[in-house]
Every structure is written in structure tokens, then in C-alpha cells.
């Protein structure tokens, strides 16, 4: 499932915390991650991701999903990009 497919199935106002995981096929030990929050964003909702994020991010494969509670709920999404 891609990030776009997942986010399209969410409520538009759900908070999404997206983490990019970079992996190397040639070196299975290589593993790096960082939060994906484009410059200037203070909040990342499903609606915002669909409307403003570039296709190269939306097409990334979802690795894991973590749903957290709270008043509105938050979706933690790990996506993977292979670097080689």
C-alpha cells in the first residue's frame, strides 16, 4: 500500500506523523529515518498530505502503521525509500 492509498482512506482532519525510512538493498545494515514534515508545516493532516505533498512522497510504500489515541487520534506512518 502506498502513502497516498492509506491517507485517502483516512478522515481528512486526522493528524499524520510520517517517518521516512531509508534502506539500502546492497547493505542490509543500513537504516536511517527522519520525520517527514515539509518546511513550514506546523500540522500535517491527511487532507494536507493529499493536497500539498509531491507524488514521489505519496508513492512511497507504507511499512508500518501505528494508531494512537487522544481526542482526535493520530496516525503514525512509516514509509520506505530504497536508496540503491
Residues covered by each model-derived region:
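Short, structural beta-strand-to-alpha-helix junction motif
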Residues: 1-4
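Short loop-to-beta-strand transition segments
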Residues: 15-19
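Acidic, low-complexity, intrinsically disordered interaction modules
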Residues: 20-79
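Short acidic DE-rich linear segments
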Residues: 82-84
